[in-house]
Swiss-Prot record:
Binding-site positions, substrate: R92, R98, N131, R162
Family: Belongs to the LDH/MDH superfamily. MDH type 2 family.
Keyword entries, A-Z: NAD, Oxidoreductase, Tricarboxylic acid cycle
Organism this protein belongs to: Teredinibacter turnerae (strain ATCC 39867 / T7901)
Top class in the EC scheme: oxidoreductase
Residues annotated for NAD(+) binding in this entry: G11, A12, A13, G14, Q15, I16, S17, N105, Q112, V129, G130, N131
GO biological process, one term: malate metabolic process
Function: Catalyzes the reversible oxidation of malate to oxaloacetate.
Reaction(s) catalysed by this chain's protein: (S)-malate + NAD(+) = oxaloacetate + NADH + H(+)
Protein name (record): Malate dehydrogenase
Length: 327
């Protein structure tokens, strides 16, 4: 058996984490031969609820769950951490503007970024799930100057999975028949679900769908799926978000499927003309515990306009919290 690795989960008593922690402990994220130490962070008022979650984890008797830490101290939660899933974030309350939300979360993610910088393993892999995920990841990354910025990612895998599912449903094919789905940009309603490079059973997906359906139904459906779930369920998507987090980390750690790629919010190196340093979703291939942006994809005017629009939104979010970012 391998030596255990430390996995930090923030917002650990929340809805998404309740769908996430048990799957991590069962080996779904890092493999059936990798023991884990779960380091769970919560705000002080939620520690009692977290204790209940830890009791349930105990009661599952997972062979791979080596031990657990429950804490309200970020420095303890990130100590020697190898993987971190930053799920906890300030939800948008009634009457809150987006900029209020950005500022409230900037405070949370700057503290966590500093704790990662000071206490985590130098090779830590960080996935930000809590919204606004791309900008929260940027804030954490900027507060961890001693950690390679490539080690901070934001989750757009839920959008990627939604895009695949909507296409599979339209064409009446299996999810397994679809490859090379791409989400560009922000995890928000400006994201661009791109089918121009996607394949269905090896054939171009874009040739199988009507252009009006693609532009006027498919793209808005994927962009606004989160809001549709809140309307139907009365709560935001939790199990599907947890599932996407598992997929994102699993592929980053263990490798993405051969001949395919995944969508990840990553540190832009200027690829496709996107401003360097933004956390932007690109098509990525993962192997040997690292990711690379897929290069050389042709981008037409339709795609370029949408890729730029979501970049502009991310620049605006960054500028809204600029005063709170380290120089």
């Amino acid at each position: 058996m391998k030596a255990p690795v430390r996995v930090t989960v923030t917002g650990a008593a929340g809805q998404i984490s309740y769908s996430l922690l048990f799957r991590i402990a069962a080996g779904e994220m890092l493999g059936a031969d990798q023991p884990v130490i779960l380091q769970m962070l919560e705000i002080t008022p939620a520690l009692e609820a977290l204790k209940g979650v830890a009791m349930e984890l105990d009661d599952c008797a997972f062979p791979l769950l080596h031990s657990m830490v429950c804490t309200d101290d970020a420095n303890v939660a990130f100590k020697d951490s190898d993987y971190a899933l930053l799920v906890g974030a300030r939800p948008r309350g009634p009457g809150m503007e987006r900029n209020d939300l950005l500022e409230a979360n900037a405070a949370i993610f700057s503290v966590q970024g500093k704790a990662i910088n000071d206490h985590a393993s130098r090779g830590i892999k960080v996935l930000v799930v809590g919204n606004p995920a791309n900008t929260n990841a940027l804030i954490a990354q900027r507060n961890a100057p001693d950690i390679d910025p490539r080690q901070f990612t934001a989750m757009t895998r839920l959008d990627h999975n939604r895009g695949m599912s909507q296409l599979a449903s339209k064409l009446d094919v299996s999810i397994n028949d679809i490859t090379k789905m791409t989400i560009w940009g922000n995890h928000s309603s400006t994201q661009y679900p791109d089918l121009y490079h996607a394949l269905v059973k090896g054939d171009a997906a874009i040739d199988k769908v009507d252009s009006t359906w693609y532009a006027e139904e498919y793209i808005p459906t994927v962009q606004q799926r989160g809001a549709a779930i809140i309307k139907a369920r009365g709560a935001s998507s939790a199990a599907s978000a947890a599932n996407a987090a598992i997929f994102h980390m699993r592929d980053w750690a263990l490798g993405s499927p051969e001949g395919d790629w995944v969508s990840m919010g990553v540190y832009s190196d200027g690829s496709y003309g996107i401003e360097k340093g933004l956390i932007y979703s690109f098509p990525c291939v993962c192997k040997n515990g690292d990711w690379e942006i897929v290069q050389g994809l042709s981008i037409d005017e339709f795609s370029q306009a949408r890729m730029t629009a979501t970049e502009t939104e991310l620049q605006g979010e960054r500028d809204a919290v600029k005063a709170l970012l380290p120089a």
